[in-house]
């Protein structure tokens, strides 16, 4: 790989220092980006069960910092920037998942990397960087809060008796963690009192996700069914919402998502999961990463879905007559 794709990690610390000097003050939007994957590395470092892997995880942390600074230092835009970002993503994932975890990790780390979210959190953080004016046009002037969120699913009123109707409302809000969302925090107040007296007012907030995506390293039939259920619940609470799944390795037969509320499943590596007997082989894992990198073409399909969604007017009942239909 080229230097841009994180090939030479022996000089990561020196390169990090140089890049600190080169990168000027970040735009406000960039400073809001959550270090989702970094948090998982730090949590693993603090995990007593991973004490054999402390040095390895510290190497991963240095590589992470280099990866993020490399993304932020890109001066390209549009398709070229997505291609550059995908190349950097492949470089970092190859180093983390093959050169570090698969090659040097303890049995605990190899078995529990999914549970520790050391692998799929990379993709979660990568997606946040796609929601940027250098890639997407017509973004609004406010923060779309991209990233993992606990997203609103449904709301119901549940008064326990007739006398309770004049008291603080009893409200049941259902929500669910999503790996990636685009949306907005909504603040609410419910009260039988028009002056919103504090004793009879229920207030709170929820995250309204208008676009959500699930990130999976491996994807089987059970996961597909779970995603279908989540998509249906998400759209029950927000009918205009979009729901996607981004998968690295497929572990099932492809199905017609039109039979569900899932808008699409993107196969990032265009690859199936390794057979069970090959998953512990370093050579097989390394070869799979080499032969099946994450494809810019597939990432762009997801970016185009976001762009089309941004450009579309989601609901315009005033135009029903001229359109000739309700929607």
Give residue ranges: language-model regions.
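C-terminal tail/extension regions appended to the core domain(s) of diverse proteins
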Residues: 1-121, 133-147, 151-159, 163-165, ...
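Glycine-rich, often proline-containing surface loops adjacent to acidic residues and nearby aromatics
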Residues: 105-110, 206-214
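Short amphipathic alpha-helical segments
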Residues: 119-127, 223
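Active-site metal-binding core of divalent-cation-utilizing nuclease and nuclease-like domains
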Residues: 147-203
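Conserved catalytic cores of phosphodiester-cleaving nucleases, focusing on short active-site segments
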Residues: 180, 209-217, 227
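Short, catalytically relevant binding-site loops at active-site mouths
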Residues: 187, 219-220, 250-253
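Active-site-adjacent loop/helix micro-motif of nuclease/hydrolase catalytic cores
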Residues: 189-194, 218-229, 236
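Short His-Asn-centered micro-motif
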Residues: 213-218, 245-249
